[in-house]
Amino acid sequence: TLAQHHDKLDGKVQCVVTWAGAIGGSYMADNFYELIKNADTDLLTGRLHDFLQLLAPQITRKGSLRRLDEYDIKGAVHSLTTHARNEFYKQYHQLLDDLNIPIINITAATTALEVPTFQMADCLNLTRYDGNNDMQVTQEQAKFKIPMAAHAAMLHGHHWDISYPPFPRAIRMTSPNLDHPFPRKAAIIAIYQLLAELGLIN
């Protein structure tokens, strides 16, 4: 929708690549939202910077997270619920298709024995919907489903594995499968090569 609402981007967006997306929302987000929708999240918001500093210090260097009082944790989680994402799709799917911009979906799939211990239950729960889930979303939830979209690849890895560097050992809680060995750089290079072969980039 950004390309639709900003004239300066008209004709400049040649392609969109989704990477372990949650376009269709997540059943996990549905469950989590039910837990927090009536809770006081002010305390959690105040400690958000400290938590993210542990989780991803390279993106939370001093001053990188500002205006924490404006963060809306409940709203953020709600935006990932299947209901919210389905409403977005109903409202915008025709607009997105009419932009005539190719969308390439890259998804992931894993098994319960390949995810962090504390994510095994969620992975198994998602298996009821899709045996090829990535521990957080199903294949259908990870893809745009419009005529201008194509599913290019299903990677072998869990949702965090293909997205994040290794988690610091101090916060792994003795869990395995948080070293995230998926070759992200090689995958990104392959995507750029594909886009070049399709004539979408030089």
Indicate where each model-derived feature is located:
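Helical cap/lid subdomain of alpha/beta-hydrolase-fold lipid enzymes
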Residues: 7-202
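Short glycine-enriched nucleophile-adjacent loop
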Residues: 1-7
